[in-house]
């Protein structure tokens, strides 16, 4: 008996409601926390522009942040819970994305949405395809087989994303914060 029959387009059917729930959460349930100064404030942006990142501390943090969800999803992908795990992952990712973007817009307005875009580039151009391949396998297995090419691609894409997030993204976000500090 098939409980879930999902295709590639249906992945968005779980991500988008999660995203909308994140927006609703920020606007209604977490509204009292939005008034507090946080990372989406002009003060934080001005401090970030002058901050130096310790690469030796940041690299292990990034590896944990990016590899742990990937490895957990990969481990579950070989069990009967793979479709449920993929759906929960998509809902959770959508929810956290909605919370993040809404919080940024609430705190900084248009600058906040642009900051979110800057914070995702360029590493998410590699993370997204890696996770989509793994999620697609979770959704379409056992009809789809995992192979060496998928493994190599996912590992290479994640490694490239981590390198870009470590070296390129901080400078991109710093340039963004300097640009908006000059215009303020």
For the regions a protein language model found, what residue spans apply to each?
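Hydrophobic alpha-helical transmembrane segments of integral membrane proteins
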Residues: 92-122, 166-170
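Alpha-helical transmembrane segments of helical membrane proteins, especially in multi-pass transport
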Residues: 93, 116-140
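Cytoplasmic juxtamembrane regions at transmembrane-helix boundaries
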Residues: 76-98, 147-159
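Terminal transmembrane helical module of multi-pass membrane proteins
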Residues: 133-184
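Interfacial helix-start motif at the membrane-water boundary
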Residues: 48-75
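Perimembrane loop-to-helix junctions flanking transmembrane segments
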Residues: 36-56, 182
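Alpha-helical transmembrane segments of multipass membrane proteins
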Residues: 18-26, 69, 127-130, 157, ...
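N-terminal signal-anchor transmembrane alpha helix
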Residues: 2-35
